[in-house]
């Protein structure tokens, strides 16, 4: 069947030192279990704007309500299962994070740490491609 293109939002959360927050996907997930992934990602619901979806996902996944997103880019990501139009945002946030119970937690990574671990099967392919 043809894959419908659906909009997705991603938010990269940095602290003021330039470290990047990543979430750990739970082991029970079908897709990429146990891998580290972009801090926030989710589908835009029907009738929702990108901005509203972003706020909803950030609140659900990290418990943040007060942040200023900046749109970096958008691209199409296609896997064997789906085709996504991804809107990538970033924000700088130094407040407390309250990861959702659905996640296996998360932490800030330095750019060096991320570079050292690329290609080792620690991160999701979608994260590594960006």
Predicted regions and their residues:
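A short acidic/small-residue loop/turn micro-motif
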Residues: 1, 28-29
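Acidic, metal-coordinating catalytic segment for phosphate/diphosphate chemistry
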Residues: 1-10, 14-16
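Short loop/turn microsegments at loop-to-beta-strand junctions
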Residues: 8-9, 49, 104
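Beta-strand scaffold of nucleotide-dependent catalytic cores
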Residues: 21-24
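Active-site segment of metal-dependent pyrophosphate-handling enzymes
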Residues: 27, 49, 55, 59-96
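A conserved beta-turn-beta hairpin within the catalytic core of GNAT-like acetyltransferases
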Residues: 29-36
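Nudix hydrolase/Nudix homology domain
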Residues: 34, 73, 80-130
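Short histidine-centered catalytic/ligand-binding loop motif
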Residues: 36-48
């Amino acid at each position: 069947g043809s894959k419908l293109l659906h909009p997705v939002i991603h938010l990269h959360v940095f602290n003021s030192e330039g470290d990047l927050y990543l979430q750990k996907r739970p082991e029970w997930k079908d897709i990429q279990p146990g891998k580290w992934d972009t801090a926030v990602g989710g589908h835009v619901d029907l009738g929702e704007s990108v901005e509203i979806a972003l706020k909803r996902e950030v609140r659900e996944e990290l418990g943040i309500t007060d942040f200023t997103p900046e749109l970096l880019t958008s691209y199409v990501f296609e896997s064997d299962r789906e085709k996504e139009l991804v809107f990538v945002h970033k924000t700088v946030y130094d407040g407390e994070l309250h990861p959702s119970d659905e996640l296996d937690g998360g932490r800030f990574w330095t750019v060096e740490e991320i570079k050292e671990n690329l290609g080792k099967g620690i991160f999701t392919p979608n994260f590594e491609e960006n």
